[in-house]
Regions:
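C-terminal structural segment of proteins
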Residues: 1-121
Length: 121
């Protein structure tokens, strides 16, 4: 699948998504866009619960991805600044009229750092 495409078949419809409640979790969603109502050029989501940290990125590849290098760095005691430098590792961001590949990589690092700091990671 590509950008703005789904893996659903022609005769399938997504009707529900269930996520477990994380009562003791902290989280942050950071996005960069031109105007508030625009799609994110790059977005970073961070969630933490009882020592576990999850990081996801949007618009850094053909589909949303987990930044597992960042998660592992946090798990091993790296600071938010150190871990966020790994945010774009392994990504193949699109280059389009909104942003080039290098700029998207820069945004991923900055937004991930902000998210880690805001969520207390």
């Amino acid at each position: 699948t590509g950008f703005l495409e789904t893996d659903l078949g022609e005769d399938e419809m997504l009707v529900e998504v269930r996520l477990p409640k994380l009562p003791d979790s902290t989280w942050s969603f950071q996005k960069f866009n031109r105007r508030a109502q625009d799609w994110a050029i790059v977005g970073s989501a961070v969630v933490g619960d009882q020592g576990i940290c999850g990081v996801g990125l949007v618009n850094m590849d053909s589909r949303p991805i987990r930044a597992t290098a960042v998660e592992e760095a946090i798990k091993n005691g790296s600071s938010a600044a150190e871990a966020s430098e790994l945010a774009a590792d392994g990504c193949e961001p699109p280059a389009d009229i909104n942003a080039g590949m290098d700029y998207r990589r820069h945004l991923a690092r900055v937004l991930t750092r902000r998210g880690l700091e805001e969520s207390g990671r």
